[in-house]
Amino acid sequence: MNSTHHYEQLIEIFNSCFADDFNTRLIKGDDEPIYLPADAEVPYNRIVFAHGFYASAIHEISHWCIAGKARRELVDFGYWYCPDGRDAQTQSQFEDVEVKPQALDWLFCVAAGYPFNVSCDNLEGDFEPDRVVFQRRVHAQVMDYLTNGIPERPARFIKALQNYYHTPELTAEQFPWPEALN
């Protein structure tokens, strides 16, 4: 983690943006990430990110930004997660649903001045996903957002990140075409 980026900052930024309007708070978790809607025990929605990892918080915020109102009323937005160890077909389906969240991850990371790394999230799979091809799909979605507009919640979060970290407005030049990944 970059010495200038701490998960506590994301909690502060996110909660100042969304705690009141969306009754949602970002919470550091000790285990796997999960989204929990308000219930009888806790009167607010919780985005719980993994182990205090800055990148995990960014990614879970991305999923929340994509989820519509009905999905935000369901545990983990009503999605099932296919764990690491996916075959080629399941990995392809996983990547299809990860393009938009990872595009938001990239936008958020640039707005925060934090390094972005695409994640195929299949370390135990029976084949090696093509990270460059996947990042090109993510790049195309980033360009679409920059050209056609970023939805309201992620745009609000981007503006808050830029204000906090004193970063410039987002431009296409900040998102290079993935030639190869190290």
Swiss-Prot record:
Gene Ontology biological-process annotations: post-translational protein modification
Highest taxon, organism lineage = Bacteria
How is activity regulated here?
Hydroxylation activity is abolished by NADP and increased by NADPH.
Keywords for the protein's UniProt record, in alphabetical order = Monooxygenase, Oxidoreductase
Q: When the coding gene is removed by deletion, what phenotypic consequences does the entry describe?
A: EF-P proteins in the mutant strain displays a modification of +128 Da, whereas a modification of +144 Da is observed in wild-type strains. Cells lack CadA activity (lysine decarboxylase).
> Tell me, what's a Pfam family for it?
EpmC
Q: What is its EC number?
A: 1.14.13.-
InterPro entries for this protein: EpmC
* GO molecular-function terms, A-Z: metal ion binding; monooxygenase activity; oxidoreductase activity, acting on paired donors, with incorporation or reduction of molecular oxygen, NAD(P)H as one donor, and incorporation of one atom of oxygen
Provide the transmembrane region boundaries.
Answer: none
* Catalysed reactions, semicolon-separated: N(6)-((3R)-3,6-diaminohexanoyl)-L-lysyl-[protein] + NADPH + O2 + H(+) = N(6)-((3R)-3,6-diaminohexanoyl)-5-hydroxy-L-lysyl-[protein] + NADP(+) + H2O
Q: Which family does it belong to?
A: Belongs to the EpmC family.
Provide the function of this protein: Is involved in the final hydroxylation step of the post-translational modification of translation elongation factor P (EF-P) on 'Lys-34'. Acts after beta-lysylation of 'Lys-34' by EpmA and EpmB. EpmC adds an oxygen atom to the C5 position of 'Lys-34' and does not modify the added beta-lysine.
> Per its record, how is this protein called by name?
Elongation factor P lysine hydroxylase
Give the organism, scientific name: Escherichia coli (strain K12)
